[in-house]
């Protein structure tokens, strides 16, 4: 472009980052050697979405098989491998690591840190997860196929007699390696939050997302080492004849206790960070501060504490656990979750709501998770649980809870923070199409499964009889699953197109009302995140930076309750 053209005011193509330099293969070298938390966060997200698509493909194969009675194109053995690997991929190779994807992308920015506490350990955690997941999935290319004993790996199904193939061993080792990556990631996040907060960033000025990652990381340190130990025991059983999980010694129940003491905190490990994501999004699109900040923090801590006291509700049907205690504790965990809902609704109440794509996905999360939570309260009652245990009612319940939380909030977070990651905005029209396809597809797939479960359709069966009367609802469910699968196409195209050609973000805060510190630096941020930090005087430093004329009023309104309490104390003293 000539100097004349520039002086005449002609538009010049700009990029949100410097032009690419370096020889061919430079990007690959950079990815392999990087210790930049933002780059690692993007790598986590991309890797997790690849696993998400693979897990979704396995689910589509299962739903196609179940659309009609009789075995269509899968054998019983193949079906067993599919549901085992589908559960494992979705929970341990997608949901858990994408927590650390978001934590890497956002947490150091939110606390004003230049990077995480241990950047090399951070990179090591990612590569452990990636190679662990690859090892776990490698069973598909072995002669005996992948693991086929269910993602819960109940003994004696997992012993050397019932699962002799190498697929089971690869599954065990893959989970051990990927789990180590998760443990190290949690150590890193705890240290980062405790040691690297910017001046003025007290614990109760941290964003809710940062709080939730901190609590989640503590839960990881409680739960994942136990899983690792249990898996090593299982490997010893299979190869050394250790007899740890022998049925004769009560080993079957031992495995269930060990697994679910990991498994239930794991459910909250993959829920709390996503509660944090929507807690960041609701205030921005409601044009209001988060309602009940401190109660949200205490609710998060309560959920974490209770989550390690309810594991045996997965074992009601064994008849070997104290039903009243675990039933009551499970009911109890609904209380802090209800407080969170109250706060989210309170944040939106009388706000100036706008429904951009992140807000749509957040509302979709709230609706779906609420329904899943209500069926969870039903399942907490042992008499009801005995009726529907191991049926499609349970499948519908945990998909409502997990898909509602993880997938809807993941998409909300990606649409929300994509401009911060890349310096470009995602396409709103494609985003709305993506949301409605996801929402309609999901509810069509899983709502009818509650009724299938109540009618008595067991989970994990590859086939059913024409006389069972399950076909009609199964066809509806399968149609919904293909709508859900189709929803990924606008998303992938949107990310690809926007990353390369999307609208360039030229401001720190493209949404206009961001609260936390990540909206006080450029899009994308410089290598060490900030060229200068604003003063941190509340939990909304970026908002106060962009709206300085509002600070006095915000202070005045924020402390009305506290001031009123002080006045009451003074009156009572006089």
Curated annotation (Swiss-Prot):
Its EC number is 7.1.1.9. Binds 1 copper B ion per subunit. Binds 2 heme groups per subunit. It is a multi-pass membrane protein. Heme a3 binds at residue 397. Fe(II)-heme a binds at residues 86, 399. One of its GO terms (biological process) is electron transport coupled proton transport. Keywords: Cell membrane, Copper, Electron transport, Heme, Iron, Membrane, Metal-binding, Respiratory chain, Translocase, Transmembrane, Transmembrane helix, Transport. Pathway: Energy metabolism; oxidative phosphorylation. The keyword ATP-binding does not apply. It is found in: Cell membrane. GO terms for cellular component: plasma membrane. There is a cross-link at residues 264-268 (1'-histidyl-3'-tyrosine (His-Tyr)). Associates with subunits II, III and IV to form cytochrome c oxidase. This is Probable cytochrome c oxidase subunit 1. It comes from Mycobacterium leprae (strain TN).
């Amino acid at each position: 472009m000539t100097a004349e053209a520039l002086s005449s005011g002609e538009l010049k193509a700009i990029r949100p980052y410097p032009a690419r330099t370096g020889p061919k293969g430079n990007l690959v070298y950079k990815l392999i050697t990087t210790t930049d938390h933002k780059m690692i966060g993007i790598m986590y997200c991309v890797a997790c979405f690849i696993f998400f698509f693979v897990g979704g493909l396995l689910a589509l194969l299962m739903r196609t098989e179940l659309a009609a009675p009789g075995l269509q194109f899968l054998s019983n053995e193949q079906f067993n491998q599919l549901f085992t690997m589908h559960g494992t991929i979705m929970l341990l190779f997608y949901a858990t690591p994408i927590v650390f994807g978001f934590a890497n992308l956002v947490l150091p920015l939110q606390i004003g840190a230049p990077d995480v506490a241990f950047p090399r350990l951070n990179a090591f955690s990612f590569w452990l997860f990636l190679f662990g997941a690859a090892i776990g999935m490698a069973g598909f290319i072995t002669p005996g196929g992948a693991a086929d004993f269910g993602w819960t790996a109940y003994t004696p199904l997992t012993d050397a007699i019932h699962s002799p193939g190498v697929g089971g061993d690869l599954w065990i080792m893959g989970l051990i390696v990927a789990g180590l990556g998760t443990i190290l990631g949690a150590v890193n996040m705890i240290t980062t939050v405790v040691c690297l907060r910017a001046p003025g960033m007290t614990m109760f000025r941290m964003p809710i997302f940062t709080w939730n990652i901190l609590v989640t990381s503590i839960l990881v340190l409680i739960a994942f080492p136990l899983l690792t130990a249990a898996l090593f025991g299982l490997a010893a059983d299979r190869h050394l004849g250790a007899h740890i999980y022998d049925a004769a010694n009560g080993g079957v129940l031992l495995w269930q206790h060990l697994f679910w003491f990991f498994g239930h905190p794991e459910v909250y490990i993959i829920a709390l960070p996503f509660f944090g994501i929507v807690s960041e999004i609701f205030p921005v699109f409601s044009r209001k501060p988060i309602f009940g900040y401190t109660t949200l923090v205490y609710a998060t801590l309560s959920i974490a504490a209770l989550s390690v006291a309810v594991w045996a509700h997965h074992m009601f049907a064994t008849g070997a656990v104290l039903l009243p205690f675990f039933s009551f504790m499970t009911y109890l965990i609904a209380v802090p979750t209800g407080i969170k809902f109250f706060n989210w609704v309170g944040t939106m109440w009388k706000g100036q709501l706008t429904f951009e794509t992140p807000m749509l996905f957040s509302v979709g999360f709230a609706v779906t998770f609420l329904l899943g939570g209500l069926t969870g309260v039903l399942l907490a009652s042992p008499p009801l649980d005995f009726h529907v245990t191991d049926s499609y009612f349970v499948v519908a319940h945990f998909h409502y809870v997990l898909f509602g939380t993880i997938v809807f909030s993941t998409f909300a977070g990606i649409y929300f923070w994509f401009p911060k990651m890349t310096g470009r905005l995602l396409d709103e029209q494609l985003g709305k199409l993506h949301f409605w396809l996801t929402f309609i597809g999901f509810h069509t797939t899983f709502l009818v499964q509650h009724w299938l479960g109540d009618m008595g359709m067991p989970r994990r069966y590859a086939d059913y009889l024409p006389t069972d009367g399950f076909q009609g609802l199964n066809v509806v469910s399968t149609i919904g699953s293909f709508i859900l699968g189709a929803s990924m196409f606008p998303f992938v195209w949107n990310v690809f197109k926007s990353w390369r050609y999307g609208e360039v973000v030229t401001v720190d805060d493209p949404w206009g009302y961001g609260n936390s510190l990540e909206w006080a630096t450029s899009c994308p941020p410089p290598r060490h995140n900030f060229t200068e930090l604003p003063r941190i005087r509340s939990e909304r430093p970026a908002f106060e930076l962009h709206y300085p004329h509002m600070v006095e009023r915000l202070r005045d309104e924020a402390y009305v309750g506290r001031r009123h309490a002080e006045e009451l104390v003074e009156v009572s003293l006089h």
